[in-house]
Amino acid sequence: KNIKNNNLRNNDILLISDVNCWDLILDKLNYPIEKGVITLIKFTIRFAIQNRLKIKIAARSQKNHFYNENIFYKKNLTNEEYRFLLKNIFFRSKNYKTYEIMQKSKITIGTMSTMLRENLYMEGKTLACNFTKTNIFDFPIKGICSLNDNDFDKFEKRAKKIISISKNHYMNLINKKPAYLVFRHQYKNTIDLVKMKLSYHLGLQEND
């Protein structure tokens, strides 16, 4: 099945890396959190390569603090996966770079980042994958936007469908309105999100 193009979103996949962003106390409870996070990275890289999709990978760290994160990738990825990741990774910055890439991506994938929720609020399509075997990181909205079964074929089928369908169709396949996420969690940057959303749509109008 061919994946439809979206001219306004010129990047296919944004993968948000959640490396080392969980509380270390969870490691003492023997949850396979690290394994779940790396499984998603591997699945997403494989999906992008096999389907020849354009991908951006958001590092957890800023460039000058990348050492430990880089070691994590080297330890857990194959040489091919590691080279692919480094070729497509970008580093966190103090500006809105990650949000800008997110707005230009057809699907945003991750496990626990708040950006998965913010992307939904900004009318983007999210796939939140919790392969950690603990419901602590379950996405608060159910439906096409969340997946807990760490089977590659199911992941690929779900991601392909999300990319292919329209935004309105996607929104009809989730069980709560995206605004639920923002107001429920009361992010400090909600005002910034609204400003970004308005600026983004104004920019699109100017380009029409």
Task: Please report, for each region that a protein language model flagged, where it lies by residue.
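Soluble or luminal CAZymes and related metallo-dependent hydrolases
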Residues: P32-L40, K154, Q186-T190
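Catalytic binding pocket for nucleotide-activated donors in carbohydrate/polymer assembly enzymes
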Residues: N79, T114-H185
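Hydrophobic/aromatic beta-strand patches that form the interior of the parallel beta-sheet core
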Residues: L14, K56, I107-I109, L127-C129, ...
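C-terminal alpha-helical cap of glycosyltransferases
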Residues: F183-D208
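Conserved catalytic-core segment of nucleotide-activated headgroup transferases in glycan assembly
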Residues: N2-L77
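Donor nucleotide-activated moiety binding/catalytic core segment of transferases
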Residues: Q62-M122
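Residues at the C-termini of beta-strands that transition into short coil/loop
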Residues: K1, S17, A59, S93, ...
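Charge-rich, solvent-exposed alpha-helical interaction surfaces
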Residues: F43, F47, R158-K161, L173, ...
